[in-house]
Each structure stands twice: as structure tokens, then as C-alpha cells.
């Protein structure tokens, strides 16, 4: 069966690299957030689309795997595929390949559709977009959350400032990495 996907090319910017000129994981997660947004917009799912339906996408869980950490100024091809909602979660796999076509990283992200009016997770989005969703998407990373058995030690408190928040007013998932 044909897989529906969305592809973009990005270059690792200076601000997205660490002191060793290697791509920071936080920057990679921002790239994935951006291609996911661009993919939705390319199929008509823009801000107005979601506003009219009173819903938003939220990141439930995500995991990333580097096969090789890209360097500053390196050009990467990002390819993202979304699976139909199952049990209230949309699986989205994004792969990054280098100029030679070798996979350098993969991100497994589970998106959740939430109703802004009802304040709850929706099992199904309530709409469909032709050639956007795949019945299945190959690839997966471990998404298990490990729970601390001995209690947690506070690392302090942090106030989320305006410049650290996304369009929904939430602390950006990539900010704290």
C-alpha cells in the first residue's frame, strides 16, 4: 500500500548546534514539530481549521534515536508520516537523512487530539483528510516512561516565560532539553 508522507530539507543552524558543532536534541525536536505543522498546513489543517473545530494537537510522548549526530551547517532531509488515530493517539514517525541518503536520526512522536471546548482527549479526530493519514506507519521507538520507585528529588522550580512558550501557551517540548 502506498505510504503518504511529507518531506522538507533543513540546514542545521549555528544556534541549533552545541559547542562541538553537533545538533542539539532540543533542536531536532523543534524540527520535527515544524515539519509536522507544515505537513498539516499543506493539507489545509491550519490555525483556522483547528479553531473552527475547537481542537488542538498535543504531544503525548516522543522518543528520538541518533544513528549519527548531524553537524552544524549540514543539510538534512526530513520525512514524516502520520498514522490514523488509534486509541486516541496519532503515531507520527519522522526520519532524518543526510546528503548521501543515510538515516541519521528518527523520532517517534505520539500526538493526541484534544477538544479545547470540552477539555478532554478525543478518541477520533472527527474529520478526515485525503492522502494525509496512513493505515499503518513502519518504525517505532521505545516510549515507556520509567517511574522512580524511591521518590523524586526536587530540582527546583521554574517559571515559564513568554519566549519559552509555543502557540498554545505551553512550555515548548524542546525548550528544557
List the predicted regions and their residue ranges.
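Hot-dog-fold acyl-thioester-processing enzymes
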Residues: 1-59, 106-108, 114-177
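Hydrophobic beta-sheet segments that form the core/acyl-binding groove
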Residues: 62-99
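Residue-level signal for glycine
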Residues: 101-103
Amino acid at each position: 500500500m502506498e505510504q503518504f508522507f511529507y518531506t522538507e530539507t533543513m540546514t542545521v543552524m549555528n544556534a541549533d548546534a552545541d559547542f562541538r558543532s553537533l545538533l542539539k536534541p532540543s533542536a531536532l525536536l523543534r524540527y520535527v514539530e515544524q515539519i509536522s505543522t507544515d505537513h498539516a498546513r499543506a493539507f489545509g489543517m491550519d490555525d483556522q481549521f483547528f479553531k473552527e473545530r475547537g481542537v488542538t494537537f498535543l504531544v503525548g510522548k516522543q522518543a528520538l534515536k541518533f544513528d549519527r549526530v548531524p553537524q552544524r551547517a549540514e543539510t538534512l532531509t526530513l520525512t514524516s508520516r502520520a498514522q490514523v488515530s488509534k486509541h486516541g493517539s496519532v503515531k507520527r514517525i519522522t526520519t532524518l537523512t543526510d546528503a548521501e541518503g543515510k538515516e541519521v536520526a528518527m523520532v517517534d512522536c505520539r500526538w493526541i487530539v484534544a477538544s479545547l471546548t470540552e477539555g478532554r482527549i478525543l478518541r477520533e479526530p472527527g474529520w478526515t483528510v485525503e492522502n494525509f493519514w496512513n493505515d499503518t506507519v513502519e518504525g517505532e521507538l521505545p516510549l515507556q516512561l520509567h517511574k522512580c520507585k524511591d521518590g523524586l528529588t526536587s530540582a527546583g522550580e521554574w517559571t515559564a516565560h513568554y519566549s519559552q512558550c509555543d502557540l498554545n501557551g505551553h512550555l515548548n517540548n524542546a525548550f528544557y532539553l
